[in-house]
């Protein structure tokens, strides 16, 4: 689903943004991307329940060799899954980044059972016979502790980008016992060291307490892979890293249509 004709943010006057360095000292100025909505009611987002389900699969058998058969397989399966009426943020080709995964699907809804239904439907579909679950994580939007105006990109009107990186994390045991002021300071510095230099990278942080082995699940989106690498790399140089017990596995891939994904897979 890559769209190289998407309108891009305007570069700062007098500055060559044709190749943005990963470790620029200068912070880039915030901007609005024309692809994104600007009329989102943030209070309404915070006052409702919003769930996300990230599901990762591996291909366990080659898809049919005939093109018409593959297209019918994917089309009918996707139609069956769509009856769950959840929002699909994207299908992502994660092949090659890891040896254990080929597909990641990101879905959104205010009802976790509908997200489960979509997952069940895919497993029960014709395409599902070729897929085996590798990893999944459910997340719930909760208002940000220190800034309730900070909304996950996936709920804040931000259009999907061409690349996505998803990973869970667990805080240190002492993190939640630190004074609020100290945690606020640490997180502010963490944000400045990453997103202030990479404002084109959009983040969605959701709570996962009690829904998996993790406390949080994050999704970063950007138009190019190097921007995702850059923001993650930059944020390693912060005090917040001292308060992380786990932040793997990572699943990263390009956004594609179901048909595109199928055309890239091995064939019988």
Give the location of each predicted region:
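Short, surface-exposed beta-edge/turn micro-motifs
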Residues: 50-52, 101-103, 162-164, 214-217
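Glycine-/proline-rich flexible loop or hinge segments
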Residues: 59-63, 99-104
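Short, glycine- and small/hydrophobic-rich beta-strand elements in well-ordered beta-sheets
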Residues: 78-101, 128-143, 192-217, 231, ...
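Aromatic- and glycine-enriched beta-alpha-beta binding-site module
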Residues: 112-132
């Amino acid at each position: 689903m890559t769209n190289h004709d998407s309108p891009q943010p305007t570069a700062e006057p007098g500055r060559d943004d044709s190749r943005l360095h990963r470790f620029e000292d200068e912070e880039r100025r915030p901007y609005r991307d024309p692809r994104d909505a600007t009329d989102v009611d943030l209070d309404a987002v915070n006052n409702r329940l919003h769930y996300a389900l990230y599901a990762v699969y591996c291909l366990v058998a080659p898809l049919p060799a005939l093109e018409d058969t593959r297209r019918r397989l994917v089309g009918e399966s996707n139609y069956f899954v769509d009856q769950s009426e959840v929002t699909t943020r994207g299908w992502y080709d994660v092949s090659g980044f890891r040896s254990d995964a080929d597909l990641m699907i990101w879905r959104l809804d205010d009802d976790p059972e509908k997200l489960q239904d979509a997952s069940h439907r895919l497993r029960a579909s014709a395409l599902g016979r070729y897929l085996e679950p590798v990893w999944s994580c459910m997340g719930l939007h909760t208002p940000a502790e220190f800034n309730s105006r900070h909304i996950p990109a996936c709920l804040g009107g931000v259009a999907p980008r061409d690349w996505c990186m998803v990973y869970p994390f667990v805080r240190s045991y002492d993190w939640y016992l630190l004074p609020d002021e100290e945690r606020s300071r640490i997180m502010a510095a963490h944000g400045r060291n990453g997103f202030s230099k990479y404002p084109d990278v959009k983040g969605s942080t959701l709570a996962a307490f009690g829904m998996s082995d993790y406390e949080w699940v994050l999704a970063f989106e950007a138009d190019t892979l190097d921007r995702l690498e850059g923001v993650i790399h930059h944020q390693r140089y912060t005090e917040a890293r001292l308060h992380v017990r786990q932040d793997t596995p990572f699943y990263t891939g390009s956004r594609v249509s179901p048909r595109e994904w199928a055309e890239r897979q091995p064939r019988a």
